A protein has these predicted regions:
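A short, hydrophobic C-terminal helix/tail in secreted or cell-surface proteins
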Residues: 220-226
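Auxiliary tRNA-acceptor-end handling modules of aminoacyl-tRNA synthetases
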Residues: 2-219
Length: 226
C-alpha cells in the first residue's frame, strides 16, 4: 500500500494508518464507479476507459517522470480550410512532456521539457544553467481514482481534446483568429498500443477569416520515449 509508512507503531501512526486505509478504500470505490459494467476499456501503454461520454487514462505510476512525446496533427479538414493552405497531415503541435505527481494536492501535473545547454559534471556554471533553463508546468489533472492495487492513477481526459488545452492548442499554433466551440467538440475514437496511445477528436469552430462554420478532425498521439 503506497499510502502507508513503515516503522514503529504509535498512537499517531495508527491514526495515519487509519487515514491511509480510508483513502485507499475511497480510491478503490471511486475506481469501481469509473470502471464498471458500462465501461469499455482498451489495453496499452495507458489503459483507456470510456464510460458513456467520458474518457479516462489509467496511467501506471512507473511511467511518471519519463519523457513522453505528444504529437498533434490534422487528419481531416473542410474544403474552405484546405483552400487556405491548412491541410490534412499538418502537425500543429509537438511537445516533450513528463507527468509528475503532486501528492499534496492529489493531482497529476504535466511539465513541458525544454532543452538546456549541456555542461560537464561538476562544472561551476551548472547551477546557473539549471536555474535559468527550467521547464515550465503546462497543466494539471485531478486524480479521479487509483486502481485496485494502487499501481496506477486515473485522470479524466475530455478537456484535453476540446481544442483549448495547453497540450492540444489548435488555433494559436496555426495563427488563425478563432476559437473552438466546446459544446460541439468531442472525442470520436481512441486506440491504445504497447508504446503509445492515439485519440482522434472532432473540433467545431466558426473561422472568421472564412466566415464559415468548420469541422476539423485532429489526432493526438503520445509516445513513451524511454
Amino acid at each position: 500500500n503506497i499510502f502507508r509508512k513503515k516503522g514503529k507503531k504509535s498512537r499517531k501512526s495508527k491514526k495515519g494508518d487509519v487515514s491511509a486505509k480510508s483513502d485507499t478504500t475511497k480510491s478503490k470505490n471511486d475506481y469501481g464507479k469509473i470502471v464498471g459494467s458500462e465501461t469499455i476499456t482498451q489495453e496499452g501503454m495507458f489503459r483507456i476507459h470510456k464510460k458513456k461520454n467520458d474518457y479516462y487514462f489509467e496511467i501506471p505510476i512507473k511511467l511518471l517522470n519519463r519523457d513522453m512525446l505528444i504529437v498533434n496533427k490534422l487528419t481531416k479538414v473542410p474544403a474552405v480550410v484546405n483552400d487556405a493552405g491548412i491541410n490534412k497531415g499538418i502537425n500543429y503541435q509537438t511537445e516533450l512532456v513528463r507527468f509528475e505527481w503532486n501528492k499534496d494536492d492529489n493531482k497529476i501535473l504535466v511539465r513541458e521539457i525544454q532543452p538546456k545547454p549541456q555542461y560537464p559534471d561538476g562544472d561551476a556554471i551548472g547551477k546557473s544553467v539549471d536555474e535559468n533553463y527550467i521547464s515550465p508546468l503546462m497543466t494539471g489533472f485531478k486524480i479521479e481514482a487509483y486502481n485496485k492495487d494502487t499501481t496506477a492513477f486515473v485522470i479524466k481526459i475530455n478537456d484535453i481534446y476540446n481544442g483549448d488545452s495547453p497540450i492540444n492548442r489548435f488555433f494559436p499554433n496555426l495563427n488563425i483568429s478563432s476559437s473552438i466551440d466546446k459544446n460541439l467538440s468531442r472525442i470520436v475514437k481512441t486506440k491504445a498500443f504497447e508504446n503509445n496511445v492515439v485519440v482522434i477528436s472532432e473540433l467545431t469552430t466558426h473561422v472568421k477569416e472564412f466566415n464559415q462554420i468548420c469541422l476539423l478532425y485532429t489526432s493526438d498521439a503520445a509516445d513513451d520515449l524511454t
